[in-house]
Design a protein with these regions (language model features):
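Active-site and adjacent substrate-binding regions of carbohydrate-active enzymes
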Residues: 1-313
């Protein structure tokens, strides 16, 4: 299930305001418990979506955190002072465009949001934050869910020093992805996550792992890794280039797609399985995404389906 938690729905539920509740649009906690139980009767399991890089700005944690610099949740999010001229702490561009920083007058500081302004990043360096997130995940395991998809997990570890990066577009900014994805030290957090939540449970886990190279896969999946599987991005990023907007397209060659798929297939084959996909809630239909406008859509769809259904995974 994509997120079914209470949410203002700024980002289709990926802005969560309560990690242990159910959005009234979808039902009640009792309905969820019934769904889990009825699925088990049919030898199926419910996999939930965990969004742990950030919360909604309407989450009680953030509402308290932004209220002052000395409250109990003050350090639960990533706050920084402005530059001497009052501008944002760094020139980082958010994944959805615009600055990755938003000013909060209550604190007189900026908060970091990798994605939308309404999705402030949680401070994983704070052990209280990690413990609260682990409790929420275990809450659902106690309810009987069969596992988790963990959203945007490669962004949870931030660099020790926040500084400007080399601009990658005419706006003078650099993608926050370049500056924060898969930062060294992230595996310490993830192995703790595994110990505190995954271990001891017969569950399935899949991480949305943008920025993990094929050579790093053994650290992320398999017996000595963290997750059962990983969503990789190399192949779906072949037609994409970073820029000022969410998705700038560029011409691409089949050889690049083949190389990206071959590398991930070889890397994962040594350790486990890789979920194969060409489209999801973040991407346009694959026929539109991968094919030029003058391509035959029927032949293109058949070609993409042939590749998709003959890969290992």
């Amino acid at each position: 299930l994509t997120p079914v938690y209470p949410s203002p729905m700024v980002d289709n539920g990926y802005d969560i305001s309560d990690y242990t509740g159910i959005n009234p649009q979808f039902g009640t906690l009792a309905d969820m418990e019934e769904l889990i139980a009825e699925a088990k009767k049919r030898d199926m399991r419910i996999v939930m979506d965990l969004v742990y890089n950030h919360s909604s700005d309407q989450h009680p944690w953030f509402i308290e955190s932004k209220s002052s610099r000395n409250n109990a949740k003050s350090g639960w999010y990533i706050w920084r002072d402005a530059k001497p001229d009052g501008s944002a702490p760094t020139n980082w561009r958010g994944i959805f465009g615009g600055s990755a920083w938003t000013y909060c007058p209550e604190r007189g500081q900026y908060y970091l949001h990798t994605f939308a302004e309404a999705q402030p990043d949680l401070n994983w360096e704070n052990p209280e934050v990690r413990a609260a997130l682990y409790r929420a995940a275990n809450f659902w395991l106690d309810k009987g869910v069969g596992g988790f998809r963990i959203d945007a997990i490669t962004y949870i570890k931030k660099p020790a020093v926040f500084e400007d990066g080399t601009p990658d577009a005419a706006d003078g900014m650099v993608s926050v992805h370049t500056m924060t994805v898969n930062t060294p030290g992230i595996l310490d957090f993830l192995h703790e996550f595994r110990r505190e939540v995954f271990d001891g449970h017969d569950i399935f886990t899949v991480g949305e792992a943008n920025g993990v190279s094929p050579a790093e896969l053994p650290d992320w999946v398999g017996e000595n890794g963290v997750f059962s599987m990983l969503f990789e991005f190399a192949h779906v990023l072949v037609p994409y280039e970073s820029g000022e907007t969410w998705c700038n397209m560029r011409p691409w060659k089949l050889t690049k797609l083949k190389a990206a798929l071959s590398a991930s297939q070889a890397g994962v084959a040594r350790e486990g399985w890789c979920p194969i996909y060409f489209e999801n809630h973040d991407r346009a239909r694959s026929v539109n995404y991968f094919l030029p406008e003058d391509a035959d859509p029927v032949l293109g769809a058949k070609a993409l389906a042939t590749v998709l259904l003959t890969l290992r995974g």
